[in-house]
């Protein structure tokens, strides 16, 4: 969890009383060093978007770890501590279809979009998804092998 330098999740909550400045952020730092940001916006009334930004990417890999950051990004969509059936199965069961991740040179970004805020349990569960993505992946060898093949195919298609 030490490699987690920054947690950025932007929640777009719809409230009955509109805020005057929708671009203001609330932010803070937890005891474990995690920084969070919350921003209200009226763009999607009744829905929230969640982001996890980790300041880790391919830059942190040693030569013998080439592509590992990308593999770990893919592994976030397999079993996690709280979602043994996989995060996508949980999200889709609740009608949430927009979620993804990207690994760059110096960061990895995960997101879950358009989450209904009417259910506080679902809101809490999406925060739990971010928590699991931050360091509670179940790294099963067979899943890692499968994702390595997927990544090879992604690279082949880009060329």
What are these regions (language model features)?
Residues 1-22:
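Bacterial Sec-dependent N-terminal signal peptides
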Residues 56-69, 74-159:
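Active-site-adjacent, His/Asp/Glu-enriched structural segments that form or flank metal-binding
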Residues 8, 42, 100-102:
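Generic marker of residues within folded, mature protein domains
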